[in-house]
Each structure stands twice: as C-alpha cells, then as structure tokens.
Amino acid sequence: MDKAAVVVRTRKVLTNRLLSRKQFVVEVVHPGKANVSKKDLKTTIAKLHKVADPETIFLFGFKTDFGGGKSTGFGLIYDNLEIAKKYEPKYRLARAGLYTKPQTSRKQRKEKKNRLKKAGKKTAKK
C-alpha cells in the first residue's frame, strides 16, 4: 500500500461497553487506485488506534463512491479475541479465518431433511 496515495480516516467513533468494542465509520481516499485491501486497512487502523492485535479488528460493508477514489465502510475493534468470537457473526469470523463450518456429507444433509419432512407430516395430521 502506497502510504502517500491512500488516506484512512475514522469517523463517528463510539465505545460500546456492552459489547466491549469500538465502532466506527472508515473512510478511505485512494485516488487513481482500485480498492485498498482489508488486510492493509487493518494494519493502518491498528497503528491509528494503537491496537496490539490486528486480528481483533473487523472491517465490512465497504461501498466505493461513483467514479472511484473514495470508499466508505464500517469497522469494529474488540477488546480481545474471545469477545470477538462471542459476538461476531460466524460468516465474518470465517472471512477472518477464525471459524470453520463443520462439513457434513450430502447424504447426511438429505437424510436429515427427509426426517424433518416426515416428522412434520405426523404433527400436521393431528
């Protein structure tokens, strides 16, 4: 990431004590460049907010303005990783590499679906 060309700003910083995190809006100005990667943004925001572990930062919901050059998104900084794993949705944890979905076989999924359908018919008759 070229430091001179990219400017990262955080607005509307709120401290959410109930969920043990900081919430903020991230503005990235990147003229003449494609979008900046979230990995680069995490390291920049970690330095900006003096965060020891960049793994506790979650960035999402980025929209690039028409014509490019500026993106706006949302960010969360949790106090520690355990709290982040407790409150973050599983899909965001999976994006960060902190969660893997247990994979069942196709046959098991189909059998479960059919069992549930069968159980639903029995309760509907009564």
Swiss-Prot record:
GO terms for cellular component: ribonucleoprotein complex; ribosome. Residues 104-126 have a biased composition (Basic residues). The lineage of its organism: Eukaryota, Amoebozoa, Evosea, Eumycetozoa, Dictyostelia. The keyword Ribonucleoprotein applies. The keyword Plastid does not apply. One of its GO terms (molecular function) is structural constituent of ribosome. PANTHER family: 40S RIBOSOMAL PROTEIN S24 (PTHR10496). GO terms for biological process: translation. Disulfide bonds: none annotated. Gene3D superfamilies: 3.30.70.3370. This is Small ribosomal subunit protein eS24. Residues 98-126 are annotated as: Disordered. Keywords: Ribonucleoprotein, Ribosomal protein. Pfam families: Ribosomal_S24e. Belongs to the eukaryotic ribosomal protein eS24 family.
